[in-house]
């Protein structure tokens, strides 16, 4: 267990103790105490698209259940995701620093610090962000949390399916994508 994990455990224990006494601790978490995560969930060679994407799941650290909040860094040349759209979950991003290119279908829009973009659930417009600059980009991504979700990837032979919280990537022929 590393030092950051120990601090996180101590903070969580204190929070749980206060809640058990009917008290609410100050809802404060420092992002420096949260381990970052890489996005490597895609099957096969598709993982390469998001090399250079890292997130800090601040919403998880705050025990939020209705929506996720991630502080994301995107290295030059990296994408936040494959081109996709959600059937049941809204998405929102706000750029904190640097710049990324929002790709929606074949249209590109540059987003810089302070710019926001939102993606309504059920609208079949494929989208993703790419850092085409030479500097790191930092953004917040916020999205609905559903136990059941389908994410479509136009131009790719699989979909993301979440049923009762269990995630599977399924090919168009019905087999599991690996």
Give residue spans per PLM region:
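Conserved short histidine dyad/triad with adjacent acidic residue
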Residues: 70-86
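Short acidic-glycine-tyrosine-enriched beta hairpin
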Residues: 106-121
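Ligand-binding loop in jelly-roll beta-barrel domains
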Residues: 121-148
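A short, N-terminal "cap"/entry segment at the start of jelly-roll beta-barrel domains
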Residues: 17, 22-66, 152-178
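Glycine- and acidic-residue-biased ligand/ion/polar-headgroup-sensing regions
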Residues: 89-90, 94-100
């Amino acid at each position: 267990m590393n030092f950051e994990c120990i601090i996180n455990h101590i903070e969580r224990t204190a929070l749980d103790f206060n809640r058990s006494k009917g008290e609410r601790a100050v809802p404060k978490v420092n992002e420096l105490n949260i381990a970052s995560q890489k996005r490597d969930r895609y099957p096969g060679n598709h993982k390469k698209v998001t090399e250079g994407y890292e997130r800090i799941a601040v919403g998880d650290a705050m025990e939020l259940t209705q929506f996720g909040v991630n502080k994301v860094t995107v290295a030059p040349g990296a994408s936040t995701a494959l081109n996709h759209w959600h059937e049941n979950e809204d998405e929102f991003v706000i750029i904190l620093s640097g710049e990324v290119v929002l790709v929606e279908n074949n249209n590109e829009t540059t987003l810089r610090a302070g710019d926001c973009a939102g993606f309504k659930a059920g609208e079949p417009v494929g989208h993703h962000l790419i850092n085409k600059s030479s500097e790191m980009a930092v953004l917040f991504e916020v999205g609905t949390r559903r136990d059941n979700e389908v994410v479509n990837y136009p131009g790719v032979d699989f979909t993301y399916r979440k049923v009762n919280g269990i995630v599977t990537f399924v090919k168009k022929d019905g087999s599991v994508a690996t």
